[in-house]
Amino acid sequence: MDLLLALLPALFWGSIVLFNVKLGGGPYSQTLGTTIGALIVSIVIYFFVQPVLSLRIFIVGIVSGLFWSLGQANQLKSIQLMGVSKTMPISTGMQLVSTSLFGVIVFREWSTPIAITLGVLALIFIIVGIILTSLEDKNDKKEGEPSNLKKGILILLVSTLGYLVYVVVARLFNVSGWSALLPQAIGMVVGGLVLTYRHKPFNKYAIRNILPGLIWAGGNMFLFISQPRVGVATSFSLSQMGIVISTLGGIFILREKKTKRQLIAIAIGIILIIAAAVFLGIAKTNS
């Protein structure tokens, strides 16, 4: 039961972009709607849990939320260019690499031979996985798709920076869990407004995309509940399984066309990235 509970964040987070695309709108209205949904749930949770809030927690949480908006908005821009099934494995891989390297450099993780071995293997798996999931169809090259791939990856670099700061700022100041949820959601809405207001995001699609925000906050809630039960490392590894849901959802629900060659490459790439997430989770416990 505890493991099933720990899988819920992956189910919730993996389905967010599928809802974003299905509900329609551009990346700006999608971003704004998602942040509003997250804020609604965070306010409700705050009144039930009533976590301790200090000025430090509030400021750090808002800064963290601002950068989450940067990450999410650019991830949705990339999806518009490359599709869900290509964007999400690459995005997940980039996030795992960046947060892992930051952990090693700043927080001195991977301090044991086992952790170093698993960590290096994980990074190799992620890089190979990203290459495989971004494999192009030979026929697409005539239609200018490689330029979309390049643009999409450049946008994902900005997205990864946003997600990295979102995670790292909270960790640097030891702000996490229930206390961070509401301040982060406020920061997300502020960031969403700043990033999107020039693009007239206030429309029916922004309202529709409140639903993915509710789902995102629900995933966070289940992550906080499951961590004490299964441990941070297991919870972290399982939460990365969302890549399976988003990628397969992109192919089978959103009907993104793939050749047999691409499907095989994507399947192998996903397996490698998931294995890397498991290795990183184990490395955390052996540091």
From Swiss-Prot:
Subcellular location(s) of the protein: Cell membrane
Q: Which UniProt keywords apply?
A: Cell membrane, Membrane, Sporulation, Sugar transport, Transmembrane, Transmembrane helix, Transport
Q: Which GO terms describe its cellular component?
A: plasma membrane
| UniProt GO molecular function | carbohydrate transmembrane transporter activity
Specify the protein's topology with respect to the membrane.
Multi-pass membrane protein
Q: What is its main location?
A: membrane
- GO biological process: any one? sporulation resulting in formation of a cellular spore
Protein task: Involved in the uptake of glucose.
Q: What is this protein called?
A: Glucose uptake protein GlcU
Q: Which organism is this protein's natural source?
A: Bacillus subtilis (strain 168)
